[in-house]
């Protein structure tokens, strides 16, 4: 029985099964029995595991089921990890202006010829909620192959929406200003 769990910031807290149930309930939008997923995931982790390991155990349970419904749940759970790694969670997604400046400052994106006004305009075309419609296989490919991440730690720095916008911005950067 798990009594403690280590949060992403390194603090050890008492394990609250209700939080696990909330993750599963949020990720299940196809009517599967998510409590089975949480119970099986609990069997796969150890006392003092990290929240990320617990989250991954839930994903692994879903992937092992090999049905579309469970794959969709795995995708939503993986998206939670992606947003946690990149931004600290779904509620902490930066604006495009802030994101671009941070990526350029960190040397992860090349400096592009866009004004703040243009970036603010492009912000209106980013719909982060679209990411939730991607299945597990798509998000796994994004995370493992295409998203910008730290080679040493594996930490991801962008979401699918920001990656797509960055590709479009780079492709059209040299176009006339009447974009």
Regions found by a protein language model. Give the residues of each.
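Extended catalytic cores of very large enzyme megasubunits
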Residues: 1-179
């Amino acid at each position: 029985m798990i009594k403690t769990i280590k949060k992403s910031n390194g603090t050890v807290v008492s394990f609250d099964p209700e939080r696990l149930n909330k993750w599963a309930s949020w990720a299940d939008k196809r009517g599967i029995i998510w409590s089975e997923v949480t119970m099986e995931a609990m069997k796969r982790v150890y006392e003092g595991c990290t929240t990320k390991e617990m989250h991954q155990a839930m994903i692994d349970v879903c992937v092992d089921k090999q049905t579309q419904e469970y794959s969709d749940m795995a995708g939503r759970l993986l998206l939670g990890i992606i947003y946690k790694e990149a931004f600290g969670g779904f509620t902490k997604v930066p604006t495009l202006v802030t994101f671009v400046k941070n990526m350029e400052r960190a040397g992860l994106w090349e400096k592009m010829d866009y004004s703040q006004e243009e970036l603010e305009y492009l912000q209106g075309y980013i719909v982060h909620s679209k990411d939730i419609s991607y299945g597990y296989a798509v998000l796994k490919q994004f995370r493992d192959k295409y998203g910008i991440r730290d080679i040493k730690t594996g930490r991801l720095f962008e979401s699918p929406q920001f990656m797509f916008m960055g590709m479009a911005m780079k492709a059209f950067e040299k176009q006339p200003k009447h974009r």
